[in-house]
């Protein structure tokens, strides 16, 4: 498929090799090497929304437009193919992570405002991410980042009535748990699988799910997922430059619940460990 899509773009000639890369649970990701040594990344997808890659390209442009975050150059975009500049895998140096903290903190600070949402809906995986504008961060996160996944068929199959009620109780208490914070431009899916490196080692973001919401949403993805040892410097450096309200580390699991519910909504019973983690986070909110 990838060769057919490249040929349709006039980029199918003199290809020396194709290599399928790891990751990419939604799209297939390929490293394309041409005879002259040039390399590009090609993402292909079938059966997804026709604007999936266009939304991704727009998100990369928005992040790059802050003037602080590095993104790969978008070379071409169609309904079934996204062609990107090829970059190196994520490195693991304290200097790179500290610079990334500066980049992300500056991007968050420079985009702060009071409206939550985005001009268009996006995607987290294959599922639509609703970005309807609101001035309430608690309402935005409750309605569009937590409750919206409960009605997905895969989630309905595995979440019990008690699970659903616990999510609803958590949403009702969000104003007690999450302090008022401004809306900033967030990457939206900022785990290490969506980070690569430029030749000089600068950390570069890929695969965004952008929206204007709390900065801590981005932090929660990095905090709650496995990460390289050198990344420990990231959190200290970020807090020096863009301090979160006190108790930020304790809020990370709550904010990361959005990711767990998304995984359940995509994979249902095929993600038992995620279901267990979700219930651990929700434990204080089950009826007693």
Task: Report residues per predicted region.
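An alpha-helical support segment within catalytic cores of ATP-dependent transferases
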Residues: 1-8, 112-186, 198
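ATP-binding pocket architecture of kinase catalytic cores
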Residues: 19-139
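Hydrophobic packing residues in well-ordered alpha-helices of helical domains and bundles
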Residues: 53, 97-100, 163-167, 274-278
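A general structural signal marking secondary-structure boundaries and capping sites
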Residues: 67, 108-115, 153, 178, ...
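Conserved PLP-binding active-site segment of the aspartate aminotransferase-like
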Residues: 83-85, 258-265
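ATP/Mg2+ or Mg2+-diphosphate-binding catalytic cores
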Residues: 233, 263-288
